[in-house]
Structures are given as C-alpha cells and as structure tokens.
Amino acid sequence: MEFDRHGLYKPHGPANWYKKPSESFSQTCPFSPAAKNEDELSLANFPVTRQQTDLLGRFQSNYVGHVVEQEYRNQGSSGGMVTWVAAELMRKGLIDGVLHVIAIADPQSDGRFFKYRIARNQQELNEGAKSRYYPVELSEVLQLIAEVPGRYAVVALPCMTKAIHLLRQQDPVFKERIPFTLGLFCGHMKSAGFVQSFAWQLNVPLKAVKEVEYRYKNPDRPANWYNAMLKLENGEIQNRDWWHLVDGDWGAGFFMSSACNYCDDVVSETADVAFGDAWVEPYSSDGRGTNVVIARSELVDTMIREAIAESRLQLEEVDGAFVEQTQAAGFRQRREGLAYRLTWAKKGIRPVKRVVADANRATKERKLIYRTRFWISKWSHRMLWLGRKMNMPGIYTSWARAALSFYHGIAYHKGNFSEMKKRYVEFKK
C-alpha cells in the first residue's frame, strides 16, 4: 500500500497482479460487491443481542459518559473510553496487544505522520490516544500478527473493522489471533493533504512539521470547537480553530476519500464495541470530552457494567434514539444521501449497498447539498495537488474559500447570496 498523488492509500504490485482476478480478494475488500455486508457479519458475530435498530445494527447496550479513573479522559480527544476498553482487555489477560494508530516520531524521514502499531503495555496504549484524521493502512501490523502468535484487539474505522472480519472468515490464523475489534464512529476518511492545508494556512512549511494534532483539547472550551495544532521541528507551536480554516467544516467533505461516498456504516456495526462523540447538548459543550458507546458483545458489555458499579466509569445507559441523534448528520449522509448518490451514473464496479437507490427521498435543497459535498471532496484533492505542483498555495486556498462559502450558503442559509458573501469575506480576514 502506497500513497497516491492525492495522499490516499492505493494497492501497488506487479502489473500481472492487477490483471489476475482474485476471489479471496473480492470477498475481503469491504467495498466489493462480492463481500458480505455489515448485517451478515454482525449476525454471525453477535447472534443473540438484546436490541437492534436499522441505523445502529445489533447491540446489547448503549452508554454516554466518560472514564473516571486515571488520566484516560484527559489524554484522549473525547471521554477516554477507547483506550480504557483496550487497556481493560489487556489487564484481564484477554489480549496480548492492541493494533492502534500512533504519531510517527520522525514524519519527515518516514513520509507519513501516523501509522498502525501494536501496543503491548499501558504506556504504549496511551500513545495512541486522540483522534487522527489521517489515512492509515493495516498491512504492516497484520504481517506481524501472522508471524507472531498471540491474541490481539484492533481499533479501527467501520470500513477497516469490516475488512478485518472479512479477513477472519478467509484466514483461520487471523480468526484465532484477532478476537476483539474496537470500532470508531466515522464521518469520512481524510487524505494526507489535509495536513498540507493546515501548514499552508498556518504559514509554515510542511517539511518543518513534526507533530499534528487535529483536535487540541481545552477543557475550558466546548468539545465541538475543534482546534488544529502543528508542532514544528524547532519546538514552535502554531494553531487555529477549524472555524477559521477555509476547509474547516467537516460536513463540506474536503479531502474525503471517494470510497466514503458509498459507505453505509456510521457506527462500526461489526465491532464488539463502538465509540463516538456525544454531539448533543449538554455534552458537546463539555470541553473535557464525552463518549457515546455501543456495546455489541456480551463480554464487553459485562466488563463495562462491572466498571460502572465500581465507579471507574461515569456512564449512563441510553436508548438507540439518543445515539442516533448524536450522529444525525452522518446518518443523513449515509442513508438519504447515499440513496441519492446511488442513482447517479457510474462507470466501473457498481457498489452493492443495504441502502436502496432513490432519487425522490431527498428534497431539492438536500440534493444540492449532496451534490456540492461530492464535488468539494472530488476537487479539493485536485486543487491541492495543483497548488503543490505550481508551488502556489493560493490556488487551493482561494478555491476552498469560495467553495466553503457557497456550501455554507446552501447548507445553513437556504442559498442566501449575502450570507455566502459574508462568509467569504470572513475567511479573507
């Protein structure tokens, strides 16, 4: 797996490999029409569950809250639950290691800012806390698992979690060695170009960047006030609120992978447990961070309930409707929006989704939003590439300023031109 010119991973191999059909590959790729879908995998993984909804899939219980013990909450972007569950599985002797994403110590020599690594103790687990909106791939760590016997948990996005379960069905070694998956809620995957955009807008050369933090945490500010921070090789720190970035609205879809347009899983439906942010009040205003948790496996649910009883976790049980509300925008994009996108003419392989193609489900206003989001995601890659090639950052930032101003006008102000102009002027300040 290597980066393409847009900072997204693509498989690379001999020319004859591309031309030779592979049944096992077709059944393992999470976006392949030949692969099992999330409903089929979830039923196989969790044949008996207490609850099920169309949007959340199968589950035992849902919770909202945070970790009380130690520094889990402070170290993470949200409530600390992802690292806590991984650590608890390790503490109980149920796993020997955790596949998670960490920052690379020397990104300039490596060519990446983040990668998957196997954590085998608490200190290494803590290094994987926080959100990383950066493309990663699993081939390196999966090779290690194949070579080194043990029991492992994987922390992954919905599509990668699905891929792990498809791989487990194909290969008995991975079925034995990966007994747990810890899924993350997902809006979409960003390309590596997002970091380049940060650097341009903060007026620092990308080659001088040592660390990237997408959500710099400040307990005195609302959790949904994202702040991007870059730490430079000389120790200098530059940061800016996402609201003041020309591509800082997540919903606009800047640098989104094209595959994300055809994904219908927001909440990691195939994972043993899944985690997201509680994007509803009063939780979204709590800068300390709050998790929403979906426990699908009975074992993990029991583990969580025991920790609540021991006052190690401050979690409140909630119903499915509450969880769905916290991710309402993501579900619109992956249900109503996907139904509309599936009606568009498309060359090549046609994705097979659980959502039925429907051009009448969305209103005209929503259709314009979905169209705009699609084209912003498509052209953001191209305009950033052109800006780099010409060594003219303004090619990208000027285009992005106009694109986001238009998006804000149609998404939040019913197409009001004066509001578009107002937002455009704000970005220029």
What kind of region is each of these model predictions?
Residues 1, 23-33, 157-163, 255-268:
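Local cysteine-cluster metal-coordination motifs and their immediate loop/turn environment
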Residues 95-96, 207-429:
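Long, compositionally biased charged/polar accessory segments in the mid-to-C-terminal portions
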Residues 1-66, 280-283:
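Non-heme iron-sulfur electron-transfer modules
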Residues 185-197, 216-221:
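Short, conserved secondary-structure transition motifs
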Residues 170-183:
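A short alpha->loop->secondary-structure connector
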Residues 9-11, 15-24, 149-152, 176, ...:
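Immediate flanking context of iron-sulfur cluster ligation sites
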Residues 77-82, 154-164, 188-190:
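Gly/Ser/Thr-rich loops at beta-strand to alpha-helix junctions
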Residues 76, 81-90, 94-146:
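Portal/gating segments that form or line small-molecule/metal binding sites
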